[in-house]
């Protein structure tokens, strides 16, 4: 199965760098437009059986960069992270792999869950230090 990385809110220059860096890994890159933020992420990734939302998104959305991955192994995730660091894109804190649970979520639901997980992780790290 083909790996797909969906990029949210990346500038054209940062997206160009990412595409170039991921080309040797044969990872397909897709830019998700704001008008698609209400679509199920499984639909955006081309997962069979996931129906599209009827309307285009016209709300405020979110501005944070996010990468959503489909058909990735742990090794492929590591390769993606290394490639993005090497090409100058750098660290992208909000990353997710599509799961059977999240494939029906829209992008707003996903980013809310990611932010909550990220905050929880930061709290745990502060407690340890």
Where are these regions (language model features)?
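Mid-chain, well-packed structural core segment of small domains
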Residues: 58-87
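N-terminal, charge-rich interaction modules
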Residues: 1-48
């Amino acid at each position: 199965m083909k790996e797909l990385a969906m990029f949210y809110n990346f500038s054209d220059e940062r997206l160009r760098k990412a595409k170039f860096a991921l080309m040797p890994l044969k990872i397909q890159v897709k830019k998700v437009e704001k008008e698609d933020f209400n679509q199920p992420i499984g639909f955006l990734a081309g997962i069979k059986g996931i129906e599209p939302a009827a309307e285009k998104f016209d709300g405020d959305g979110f501005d944070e960069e996010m990468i959503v991955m489909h058909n990735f192994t742990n090794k492929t995730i590591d390769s993606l992270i290394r490639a993005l660091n090497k090409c100058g894109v750098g660290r992208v804190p909000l990353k997710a792999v599509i799961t059977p649970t999240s494939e029906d979520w829209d992008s707003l639901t996903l980013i809310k869950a990611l932010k909550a997980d990220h905050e929880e992780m930061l709290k745990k790290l502060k407690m340890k230090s």
